[in-house]
């Protein structure tokens, strides 16, 4: 059991996860070393609204001035992370919640001054993750990081990709509410960068699936060998521990 698997759950998924998801994590843990990264968008938006702070996004990234970063940190590292950890442990999965600040786990480079405290992963302190896993814990990571002793928000997909690349993970699994990429009603089991561009251009990939495949492509560029897009409501593992959904790799045809 030497290979790593990184699982990313978006914030909109966390309240909807059922027993099937947790059973799948148990299966994966029997075969691999598992790390989970989560988002928290809906809960952050709700808390910002409560605080009368406007929500603004540019190119899919949350504009994060200091007052927004304070809320992001409070939600991601607090209620969202701890509720997810407790849910995992309720299903007999031993988990430890961490943020990217803990142990300098995630170091970042700022994206741009215009969007404030938003960073991209530049370094991952993998020893912390490996230590937790060696003690039989599942690390559950809230995607914030540090730069020059300041705290930055990180897109959860970007954080998961950075962690997967740093661990030389066998696979990055993106949890969604659909079976994967669908073409004429049928599941696309395998695809690659060039075919994804074609499918987007033809309108096969639309709406909420576009950010998922863009995250997959970004992960490939960072060195992750395989990305799976799977449905949270179905058993997305085979008996072997392999994922069932859409697999994105380099140079693989969907035909």
From Swiss-Prot:
Compartments it resides in: Cytoplasm
Known catalytic reactions: N-acetyl-L-glutamate + ATP = N-acetyl-L-glutamyl 5-phosphate + ADP
Keywords, sorted A to Z: Amino-acid biosynthesis, Arginine biosynthesis, ATP-binding, Cytoplasm, Kinase, Nucleotide-binding, Transferase
InterPro entries: AceGlu_kinase-like_sf, AcgluKinase_fam, ArgB, Asp/Glu/Uridylate_kinase
Entry EC no(s): 2.7.2.8
A GO term from the CC aspect: cytoplasm
Name of the gene this protein is made from: argB
Protein family according to the UniProt entry: Belongs to the acetylglutamate kinase family. ArgB subfamily.
Binding site for substrate: 40-41, 62, 153
Associated pathway: Amino-acid biosynthesis; L-arginine biosynthesis; N(2)-acetyl-L-ornithine from L-glutamate: step 2/4
Gene3D superfamilies (UniProt xref): Acetylglutamate kinase-like
Known role: Catalyzes the ATP-dependent phosphorylation of N-acetyl-L-glutamate.
HAMAP family: ArgB
An annotated Gene Ontology molecular function: acetylglutamate kinase activity
GO biological process: arginine biosynthetic process via ornithine; L-arginine biosynthetic process
Major enzyme class: transferase
Alphabetized Pfam families for the sequence: AA_kinase
UniProt name for this protein: Acetylglutamate kinase
CDD domains: AAK_NAGK-like
Domain of life per record: Bacteria
């Amino acid at each position: 059991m030497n290979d790593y698997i990184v699982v990313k759950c978006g914030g909109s998924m966390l309240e909807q996860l059922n027993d099937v998801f947790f059973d799948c994590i148990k299966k994966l843990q029997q075969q691999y070393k598992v790390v989970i990264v989560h988002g928290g968008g809906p809960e952050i938006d709700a808390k910002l609204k409560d605080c009368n702070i406007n929500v603004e996004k540019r190119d899919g990234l949350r504009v994060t001035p200091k007052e927004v970063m304070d809320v992001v940190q409070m939600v991601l590292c607090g209620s969202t992370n701890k509720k997810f950890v407790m849910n995992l442990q309720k299903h007999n999965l031993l988990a430890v919640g961490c943020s990217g600040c803990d142990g300098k786990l995630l170091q970042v480079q700022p994206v741009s001054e215009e969007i404030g405290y938003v960073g991209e992963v530049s370094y991952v302190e993998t020893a912390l993750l490996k230590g937790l896993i060696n003690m039989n814990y599942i690390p559950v990571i809230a995607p914030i990081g540090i730069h020059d002793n300041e705290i930055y928000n990180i897109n959860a997909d970007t954080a998961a990709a950075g962690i997967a690349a740093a661990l030389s993970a066998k696979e990055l699994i993106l949890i969604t509410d659909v079976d994967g990429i669908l073409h004429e009603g049928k599941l696309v089991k395998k695809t690659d960068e060039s075919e994804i561009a074609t499918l987007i251009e033809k309108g096969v990939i639309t709406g909420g699936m576009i950010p998922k495949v863009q995250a997959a492509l970004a992960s490939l560029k960072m060195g992750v060998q395989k990305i799976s897009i799977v449905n949270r409501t179905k058993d997305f593992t085979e008996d072997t521990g392999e994922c069932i959904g859409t697999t994105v790799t380099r140079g693989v045809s969907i035909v």
